[in-house]
Amino acid sequence: MCPPVSVRHGARGMSCLYGAWLYQLVHGEQMKMCFACFKAAFLLNKFYLEMGYWEQEELSEEEEEEEVWDAEPMEHLSESESLESDSKQDAGSEQDAGSEPNTRSEQDAWQGVGSLYVPQSVSEYGGPGALVPTPSWTQWVVFSISVPTELLPQEAVPLDLGPEDVEWTQALPWRLDVLFPCSHRLIPPLSWWDILDVMPSLGQPVLLELRSLWPLDQSVAQTWLQDQKFVLLLDSIHFMCHLLSMHVCWAVRTQVQHWQVLLNPGEMWVAHLKRVLFRPRGLYPWSLSILKSSDLGMELVPAAFYLRKKGFWVGSFLPWNSSIPETWSWDPGERLFITDATICATNYHFARSFFP
């Protein structure tokens, strides 16, 4: 699997560098580095590449290769000289035997001018498209021929990477062999909340880090997480609320036996609540919830509570800025049902309703 370099994360509110960091967290070899340190290492690597830090090392390697290639043609040239001397002796013996003068002159011209000379009789016989045999040692001479160019080094224009890689720095090769873990605490406790110090927006993904409370089958757990209908409770007025659907992009198990779920924002809904006993309390803005079907209809349950029942404990809810706030979820209390919901706005595309 290739890193998410050519994917347009910017349209979803995520930079390519941030997507690469997420990829390393999920698929890397137990990398324990926060995004701030990951970005600092990337910028340092970019600085070294721009300053030509590895140019001297690369030039030394190229010089060694050139020396090897220069030695090989000289060996073949020495062998060819001995072959030419033998051929001259054979030509002298044929001349004494009384060969034709035209053939003798063509052979002398061939040997005098070199392998790149084509006799006139051969070119006339074979035509413009004929293949003319040349000595075997000439294939080594081709490597030593330098082809001039009309462009000067300062006139060279870098190739355009296209719209898929608008951030040109993402195409630079990583020269860092090892990313050492930073001193910031990742596990435990998970502290990714210092990455972004703003509240979630309609175009910003949410990353959940989950821990298993008991052993779970990997394929079953992954399928169950991908099938959940996550929503963000934006606000509530009386018995009406605004919900932001959060589509599950992927759910993977990390190298440290944790689960990561990336939620991508989708449509905004206007939902009408149904009161069961009395008005539910504790509905806070930006509360992550899950819609699940029940005997009484579609029920809105807190994500932390419902995930805990299925064996998952929420370790982090990115992007909060300090720690998991008390208002990010609420206790079940009274059951909260939704009678109907309609789409009021969308950022990317229209999707079909949660309800049949």
Swiss-Prot record:
A Pfam family this chain is assigned to: TEX19
Localization per Swiss-Prot or TrEMBL: Cytoplasm
InterPro entries: TEX19
Residue ranges, compositional bias (Basic and acidic residues): 73-91
Record-level GO BP terms: cell differentiation; male gonad development; male meiotic nuclear division; placenta development; reciprocal meiotic recombination; spermatogenesis
Swiss-Prot/TrEMBL keywords: Cytoplasm, Differentiation, Meiosis, Spermatogenesis
GO MF: piRNA binding
Spans annotated as Interaction with LIRE1: 1-78
Cellular component per GO, a single term: cytoplasm
Biased composition (Acidic residues): 59-72
Positions of region (Important for interaction with piRNA): 139-186
Region (Disordered): 59-107
Superkingdom to which the source organism belongs: Eukaryota
Transmembrane parts of this sequence: none
Function text: Required during spermatogenesis and placenta development, participating in the repression of retrotransposable elements and prevent their mobilization. Collaborates with the Piwi-interacting RNA (piRNA) pathway, which mediates the repression of transposable elements during meiosis by forming complexes composed of piRNAs and Piwi proteins. Interacts with Piwi proteins and directly binds piRNAs, a class of 24 to 30 nucleotide RNAs that are generated by a Dicer-independent mechanism and are primarily derived from transposons and other repeated sequence elements.
Subunit architecture: Interacts with UBR2; does not lead to Tex19.1 degradation and stabilizes it. Interacts with piRNA-associated proteins DDX4, EDC4, MAEL, PIWIL1, PIWIL2, RANBP9 and TDRD6. Interacts with L1RE1.
The protein, known as: Testis-expressed protein 19.1
Gene name of this polypeptide: Tex19.1
